[in-house]
């Protein structure tokens, strides 16, 4: 009898004060950003990758990555979206992606063993996401993924 009473009391305390409204989901809001003008270090200030060599940059190493977003984010891809690589706050590469394709190619410049974070700009929401998985460590003349088997990079929206 005591257990039954506790359950009834807990249900009664969860009800609203005579309010029969259905709770509504409120989408979280995040900081919106204007279109970032990320500059590729190999392109002399241009914001597109030109496939230049690492000799055109002040860095001794470069690597190539083929990247895709997780399935949950692919449905929202647009041709206005951007992807870039960073070491701290410094842009180390800007990705290219053929129109309406899901695979990004990015050449990343820096020094061997530097930790790299990818940033993804989702143009329709004006959100910037940071990569959280996998860990990306720059390796000289290295490669992560291929066009046919790209690395899936999981992202978290910047708040």
Question: Where in this protein do the model-derived segments appear?
Answer:
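Bacterial Sec-dependent N-terminal signal peptides
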Residues: 9-42
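Short amphipathic, basic-aromatic surface patches that mediate peripheral association
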Residues: 53, 58-75
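Tryptophan-paired
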Residues: 81, 86-114
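Short hydrophobic alpha-helix segments
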Residues: 95, 131-132
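Extracellular beta-sheet/turn segments enriched in Thr/Pro/Gly and aliphatic residues
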Residues: 47-57, 133-159
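Bacterial N-terminal signal peptides
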Residues: 2-10
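Short acidic/polar inter-strand loop motif in beta-rich domains
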Residues: 120-131
